[in-house]
Amino acid sequence: MLHHDYNYANDTGDIEPMKITILDDYYDTIRHLPCFEKVAAHDVTIWNDHSQDVDVLAERFKDTEALVLIRERTHIRKALLERLPNLKLISQRSVYPHIDVDDCTRMGIMLCSSQHAGTPSYATVELTWGLILSAMRLIPQQMKSLQAGKWQMAVGKSVRGRTLGIYGYGRIGTAVAELGNAFGMNVQAWGGEGSLDRARADGIDVPASRETFFATSDVISLHVRLYPSTRGIITADDLGGMKPTATLVNTSRAPLIEDGKLVKALNAGRPGFAAVDVYESEPVTDTAYPLLNMPNVICTPHIGYVTEDEYNVQFTDIFDQIVAFNAGNPINVINPDVVKGE
């Protein structure tokens, strides 16, 4: 089934139910979360498939008053917004490069997006380490070999004693670094001045230069939010300066790396390996996608935050924003000019 409708109109008259549409809930997870009760008094439609077709989306959202997005899965651009006369609110979490904020403001549509400044995504931290260990110990390759009727196919590498480079020492980067220390790795960090200051304060090594960071790390894990200023922040020169035995891990956003440069760098042998959870365009359904067919790459389908526990944390924020908006006290407003009526 592509979608489900839930009409829980409140008989008490305490609130005015809103027409809420939730997108891209691939596994029909959200209605089973404890936090779903927060919107139980509203008229909720959940779509389990994905579409980026403007005509399809306009038809689906024609009566929608509050639109719920799961991260950046669906782009909300001017051509779509102009066809949604009933839309009052977009509620989501984290950054919003997939939304035309200025057009939302011009059309009187409020964007509320919690930036979750305090708690890191521990689910993403866990996946990052799953990818690091899988890459170092060649776990997917060993399993594929075993399924083919063969025994051990190669010798892996231990992480203990090797150097872990954290690019972006924020909430997630800090948690990844803590586990690196627990594994007995030598942890170093690079990034903006804020990252470097936090790293130094925590006793994390900061190399003398960016070049040294890339040249000396055995594993580099990226933990930077995607903004216009960080797009392409990892350059071909950075990648080319890595060891041929090194592994690059990206559970952040693919456009942090210069477009097309990762595949070229891997083909050139520096770095020697990569483990990625994010892609330039998602979802990736083309089996000919270059990274999927490289023997020195491990790929997962952007599942860093995809756990029941993380979903409940995220959708608690998202639903709280809807409840607050409906009560006339919006929170986490990205475009406050809508509130001002400008």
Per-region residue spans from a language model:
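Glycine-rich NAD(P)-binding loop of Rossmann-like domains
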Residues: 142-175, 184, 203-204
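Rossmann-like dinucleotide-binding domain for NAD(H)/NADP(H)
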Residues: 111, 244-342
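Phosphate-coordination loops involved in phosphoryl transfer and adenosine-cofactor binding
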Residues: 17, 87, 160-163, 236, ...
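Phosphate/diphosphate ligand-binding glycine-rich loop within oxidoreductases
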Residues: 64-143, 157
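Oxidoreductase and adenylate-handling cofactor-binding alpha/beta cores
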Residues: 125-144, 178-185, 315-329
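Rossmann-like adenosine-cofactor binding region
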Residues: 59-62, 75-79, 193-289
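N-terminal glycine-/charge-rich "phosphate-binding" loop or analogous flexible N-terminal tail
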Residues: 3-66, 70-71, 184, 326, ...
